[in-house]
Structure formats: structure tokens, C-alpha cells
């Protein structure tokens, strides 16, 4: 099984991979869903502060590989017979290193400017998103403290998402097809 890791700052366009995965019948496991699930398990409502604090606590408890460990266990238990599995939302170089110790992994980084990402996040109405610039910046700082910048800069592939959505999806699909060896 080969894993395809998707990384990028919040609002960069990582979730676009889900539509491509459906097209190619490839499973997607979201690391963010793991954190949101843990937040709800603790009885806390989903908002930027609670989800962010849960991510920090998970890393304090389990170390810097915290989200990768349960995520990879889940992938191995549920999808061991798949040729490819996408792990969406890798944020830490430690997570990358952990996964690479246990599986073949290629990383696709999706990049968008802070202004573009803030506009997207303000409009998508998810519980852990914010319409406030300062909260947005705090979230970015938290993500950068997880070493997501290193993951992005060391990614195997980079796709920029600043303009037309269909151009972005086409670029992402072309990158995706290189990894899964489809013409």
C-alpha cells in the first residue's frame, strides 16, 4: 500500500482531494477528523480554540507523532488491502517521519496565501473556522508550531491554489495521476 499525504495551511484547498479520490476510488482518511473526534469525545464543542487545544494536548500526551499514530493504525486496520490511501491534513514533520518508517509515503503540499485562505475560511461555516483575522493568525501560528512549514517545504509535490478553482483541480489531478501512475 502506498500512502499519499496531503498538507497545507487551513483553507488552502486540501479537501479538494476528496473529489479526486472518489473519481479514482481511493480512500481518504482525514487527520483533522481525528482531532475533531477527540475534541467531541472530551465533551467540548467544536470551535477553533477547543480543536486547537485538543491538538496540542494530543501532542503533549503522545508526543509529536500523536495524530499519525492512531491515524496509521486506523489505515492499517481498515484499508490494508488498498493500493493507495490518502491521508489528508498532515501537519508535522514528525508525523511524516513516523509514517515513512511504517509505509511508503508521497506528500502533496497545497499552498494559498493567507488572504486567500482567510476569505475561504470565513465563508465555509465549519465550527472550528473563524471569521476573525486575529483568531485566524493565532491558528496559523499554532499550525506553524507543529512544523507544518517544514512538511510543506519538504513535500514531494507542490500545487498552488490562488486562482481559478478548476485550474487548481486540474493541477492537483495531474500531480495525483503522477503518483498513482495513471495517464
UniProtKB/Swiss-Prot annotation:
| Amino acids binding ATP | 8-15
Q: Which GO terms describe its molecular function?
A: ATP binding
Origin, by domain of life? Answer: Archaea
> What Pfam family does this protein match (any one)?
AAA_17
Read off the Gene3D superfamilies from this record: P-loop containing nucleotide triphosphate hydrolases
Q: List keywords of the entry alphabetically.
A: ATP-binding, Nucleotide-binding
Q: Which family does it belong to?
A: Belongs to the UPF0200 family.
Q: What is this protein called?
A: UPF0200 protein MMP1282
The species this protein belongs to is: Methanococcus maripaludis (strain DSM 14266 / JCM 13030 / NBRC 101832 / S2 / LL)
